[in-house]
Amino acid sequence: MVAGIHSLLLLLFYQVLLSGCTGLIPEEGKRKYTESGRSSPQQSQRVLNQFELRLLSMFGLKRRPTPGKNVVIPPYMLDLYHLHLAQLAADEGTSAMDFQMERAASRANTVRSFHHEESMEEIPESREKTIQRFFFNLSSIPNEELVTSAELRIFREQVQEPFESDSSKLHRINIYDIVKPAAAASRGPVVRLLDTRLVHHNESKWESFDVTPAIARWIAHKQPNHGFVVEVNHLDNDKNVPKKHVRISRSLTPDKDNWPQIRPLLVTFSHDGKGHALHKRQKRQARHKQRKRLKSSCRRHPLYVDFSDVGWNDWIVAPPGYHAFYCHGECPFPLADHLNSTNHAIVQTLVNSVNTNIPKACCVPTELSAISMLYLDENEKVVLKNYQDMVVEGCGCR
């Protein structure tokens, strides 16, 4: 980990110093590196540790995640990430995702996924229906995030057996919010219907149910979270139809089971009030091009951040790295048009030409863009989040 920190964080550290940024680097570290030019290994490691903590804080993390080796990334979250990349690469007016998914993501900059607690008890079932209770621990959702929508995803398997009638090919799945748990064994819980779906047996697929009202009640209104009741009604009571075609529990033969990939999943879409939503198009301004530009003048330089070099690839699922770029170069008098200067920078440079006590304008980022990251948080929950101001799109003298 120490070697990884030195390989990339030192590079980031010096480039941020060169670019004139003041937000990421601790002031103590700045003085040590700028005044002495060289520090002891202990001082260097302490500053780099502070820098890593600052970066983690920028990602909204209190500590470095250390996920276990058996953590499973839901395929749906990977699909969301790749669909988002396809959306960014698509031409204006085209979309790579369905309407429901795009509508949910258009109001959120964070997507979180939760697997249910498998220790929850099963509600006794009857010949006509299969009923089970699901509980999801949502304590990892920060208080400052506003949940804009939520969906419960349940996998159902294709039924191959012959049917006595067309009606026996259908099942109805009802999703209930448990408003009040059962007070006694003889009485069931108080529930409220959230969503319902009439499903056909002809294919294996995921079914998505809108559970936004329940999540909003639990989080926004600070009301108790007692979980959901999933009810599968077997229409026509055909004895040939397997009652377990909707996967709501683990198989008794886990060695032959793909349960981790198809277990029920709760997905929340939220916004922390920072930056743009995941699928809101951002128009980028065209960068100024100049045929003859001095190599020493202010311009954008390549900088690739490889998360494996820092040892963060165990909790950052995607991307493996990204092109951050940085700004560096001179802002000479007089400032040329291609240096994208402000009026204040022009005046400051003019004053510097006659009074060197006034510093020159600095070469800094003038336009930044966001990246999306899929990662595991401190609680091993999979998160897809849009991070603002991560990529330098343009530089100028300011």
UniProtKB/Swiss-Prot annotation:
Q: Provide the primary localization.
A: secreted
**Glycosylation positions?**
N137, N202, N340
Pfam families attached to this UniProt entry: TGF_beta, TGFb_propeptide
Q: Which segments are removed on maturation as propeptide?
A: 24-284
User: The organism sits in which domain of life?
Assistant: Eukaryota
Gene Ontology MF term list: cytokine activity; growth factor activity
Instruction: Return one Gene Ontology term, BP aspect.
Output: cartilage development
CDD domains, per database record: TGF_beta_BMP2
* InterPro entries, A to Z: BMP2_TGF_beta-like, Cystine-knot_cytokine, TGF-b_C, TGF-b_propeptide, TGF-beta-rel, TGFb_CS
Q: Does the keyword Disulfide bond apply?
A: yes
Q: Name one GO cellular component term.
A: extracellular space
Where along the sequence do coiled-coil regions lie?
A: none
Q: Where in the cell is it found?
A: Secreted
The entry sums up its family as follows: Belongs to the TGF-beta family.
Complexes and interactors: Homodimer; disulfide-linked.
The name this protein goes by in its record: Bone morphogenetic protein 2-A
Species source reads Xenopus laevis (African clawed frog)
Name of the gene: bmp2-a
